[in-house]
Amino acid sequence: TWAVASVHGEAARLRALHAKLSERIRADENLVYLGNILGHGDAVGDAVEELLSFRRALLARPGGEFRSIVYLRGSQEEMWQKLLQIQFATDPREVLQWMLDRGVGATLEAYGGSAEEGVVAATKGPVALTEWTGNLRDAMRARDGHNALMSAICHAARTEDGTFLFVHAGLDTERSLAQQTDNFWWGAGGFEEITAPYGGFSKLVRGFDRRHPGIEVAAFTATVDGGCGFGGPLLAACFDGDGELVDTLEA
C-alpha cells in the first residue's frame, strides 16, 4: 500500500511525485492519499486536477483496475465543507477568521473567493453569506470532478486484511472508530506514544503532524509528513502486507 502525505495545494510537487510513483506502483497495490489536498499552497485547484488526472491514468492502464484508490478527509477538507455552511454558524466572522488562520484562504482563492468578501458577507448577515457560499459551490461544481472528489473522501481507511488503518492526523485510542469525530483531522495527541495495537490493526498510518518529521515508523504507528506546504517536500511511503516500510518517494 502506498500512502501519500498532506499536499497542501502544492500541485507541482504532487505532479513530480506522481511521475515517480507511476513507475513504482503496481496494479495489486492500494493507493491512499492521507488528506489535506487543499489549503495553504498557491495551486489548490491544480492539485485537485492532478489528483483526478493521475487517477484516470492509473485506471486506464492495461492489465486491470487498481485494487483501491482512496482519499481521506483532512483538516483542510473538513474546514472547506464547514465554510460552505458558514451561514449557519453562531458567529460566522469568528469561525471564518479561525479557518483563515489555519490556511483555508488558499482554497477560497482557488474557487474564486476571498477572505475580504467573506468578512463583508458575514457582517451583512445570513442572506449575504448564503449567496457567497453559493457562489463558491458553483465555482467548485464548474470544475469537472472537483465536487465529486470532495463527496467521495473518507474519514479513515482500512485494508481488507485488517493490517492497516489510515487516518489524517491521529485518533483517540480510548474511543472506537465511530466515536473519533474531529480526532481524525485535528489529532488527539500522543500518536507517537501509541505502544499497542488499536482496534485489531497492526499499524496506524497518518499523513499530517504539526512537527512535519518526515517519515517516522514505530512498532504500531507510522507518520508520513515532510512539511509539504510549509517549505518541505511531499512524501509517499509504501508498506508491505506485514506493516513494514519497503519504499519511499520524495518530490
Question: Where do the model's predicted regions map?
Answer:
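Feature recognizes metal-dependent phosphohydrolase scaffolds
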Residues: 1-251
